[in-house]
Amino acid sequence: MLFKSKTSLFNYLLKLIRIGSGSQGVCYLDKANGKIYKIFHDFYDDDLEEEFKVNYTKEEFTKFSKISNDTYVFPEEIIMVGFKVCGYITKYARGLDLCGINPFTINLDTFTSDISNAHQGVEQLSKDQIMSYDVLYNILYGVNGFKIIDTTDYSFTDLDYQALHKQNKEYFDRAVKLFLVSNFFNSFVNTQKDLKEMYKDADSLEFLKLFRQRLSEQLGNEVLYLRDAKDLVKYTKNTD
């Protein structure tokens, strides 16, 4: 998407909804087409000396434009002012930052199904020979399951499929296990030898199955939401 000047881009952005910002830039939503427009911070800083600005290239943001994946959200098009890349366009991923969701509100049946679907996305990513990066704080979760955003630092790799898939899956699984356990159930997990070992290394689906089973056994009834196990909570500072 090409704009002749900063002013023309700013005028265009005024028609959109500002939905937030991160370390890389500011995001705007176009509700009409369901797209996100991400504008890099450098673009707004007129006082930043040119030598300190990042010179982005088209290739950085179009390398995955033909990749189809239901879990990972990739840039589809770049935004340029003149000859300068100042942002990119991607589809809108509905959901909230997983790190900011209260785990007690999650239906564990639905969560289990959504993890399974996300694992299919991880598998496809690995088949496409793409190495993920910085997954932990870039996971959204909502009615459409897991969506992983801010994928611009991902890269194609020659790593063999098994090793690549293991690495990509571990990045995702670690985030899920942290979400389920961190600060609330650390003490409970640490008292269960098998759970403790699985928390370190296991697939998040396998861990969740046993975690839920152990909670249910301890309480004497089926745990559907983690809030059902609130009597087992011991508030601990996360050290992972």
Predicted features along the sequence, with ranges:
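Protein kinase-like catalytic core scaffold
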Residues: 35, 71, 88, 147-150, ...
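Conserved kinase catalytic-core helix
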Residues: 100-140, 146
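ATP-binding glycine-rich loop module of kinase domains
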Residues: 12-78, 102
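Conserved hydrophobic "DFG−1" position in protein kinase catalytic cores
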Residues: 29-30, 92, 140-142
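Conserved structural core of kinase catalytic domains
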Residues: 68-114
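Well-ordered, non-membrane alpha-helical segments in soluble/globular domains
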Residues: 48-61, 114-116, 165-174
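C-lobe/activation-segment region of protein kinase-like
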Residues: 141-240
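A short, low-complexity linker immediately N-terminal to eukaryotic Hanks-type protein kinase catalytic domains
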Residues: 1-15
